[in-house]
């Protein structure tokens, strides 16, 4: 089956040579169900955010484009509240620009570029597009707030958990007559790094 063989090659390349700030893998050994993560670019309102996407590969791939949507909420004129993305290579001609020579890495890289350079003239969210055009400061503020609230949520939870552990430790020490040496806390969050390579299972 062409889809399976093509996917195997593409996932192998994504594993050994991932585009900067992008990672992709198969979800629960399902051939057509992939997940991807894109690291928000520097000097953008999405900086330091990790955005998860769902990538569904149709049976006629690569003659049909993958179906991609954001699972992580993002404030962006070309991405709606359900995660749908307005991008030409995600649609077939004549309305779109998908062609079989493109691949998953190309799609994810294009989405990463769209995050850095929104296209307000072809929006899915008209109100956000208008804000981007005419009130850029307000747009940047809201986009950063969404990134903090949704794309960095795990980091905040880990920090809160570590803070709670420290408070408990301080309380116990205040009631103790002996001085104890502090132990290093485990369970620190693993930072997302585009250089980290993952092992991706091939299709069965």
Curated annotation (Swiss-Prot):
There is a cross-link at residues 190-191 (Glycyl lysine isopeptide (Lys-Gly) (interchain with G-Cter in SUMO2)). It is found in: Nucleus. The keyword Nucleotide-binding applies. The keyword Cell membrane does not apply. One of its GO terms (biological process) is protein monoubiquitination. Residues 150-204 are annotated as: Disordered. Interacts with FANCL and BRCA1. Accepts ubiquitin from the E1 complex and catalyzes its covalent attachment to other proteins. Catalyzes monoubiquitination. Involved in mitomycin-C (MMC)-induced DNA repair: acts as a specific E2 ubiquitin-conjugating enzyme for the Fanconi anemia complex by associating with E3 ubiquitin-protein ligase FANCL and catalyzing monoubiquitination of FANCD2, a key step in the DNA damage pathway. Also mediates monoubiquitination of FANCL and FANCI. May contribute to ubiquitination and degradation of BRCA1. This is Ubiquitin-conjugating enzyme E2 T. The lineage of its organism: Eukaryota, Metazoa, Chordata, Craniata, Vertebrata.
């Amino acid at each position: 089956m062409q889809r399976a063989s093509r996917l195997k090659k593409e996932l192998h390349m994504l594993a050994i040579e991932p585009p900067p700030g992008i990672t992709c893998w198969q979800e629960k050994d399902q051939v057509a169900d992939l997940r991807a993560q894109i690291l928000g670019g520097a000097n953008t309102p999405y900086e330091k955010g990790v955005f998860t996407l769902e990538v569904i590969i149709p049976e006629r791939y690569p003659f049909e484009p993958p179906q991609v949507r954001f699972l992580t909420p993002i404030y962006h004129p070309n991405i709606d509240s359900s995660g749908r993305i307005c991008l030409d290579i995600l649609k077939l001609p004549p309305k779109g620009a998908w062609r079989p020579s493109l691949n998953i890495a190309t799609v994810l890289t294009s989405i990463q570029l769209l995050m850095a350079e929104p296209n307000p003239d072809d929006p899915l969210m008209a109100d956000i597009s208008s804000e981007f055009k005419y009130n850029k400061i307000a747009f940047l503020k809201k986009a950063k707030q969404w990134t903090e609230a949704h794309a960095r949520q795990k980091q905040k939870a880990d920090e809160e958990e570590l803070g709670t552990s420290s408070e408990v430790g301080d309380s116990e020490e205040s009631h103790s007559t002996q001085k104890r040496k502090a132990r290093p806390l485990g369970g620190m969050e693993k930072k997302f790094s585009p250089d980290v390579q993952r092992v991706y299972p091939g299709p069965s």
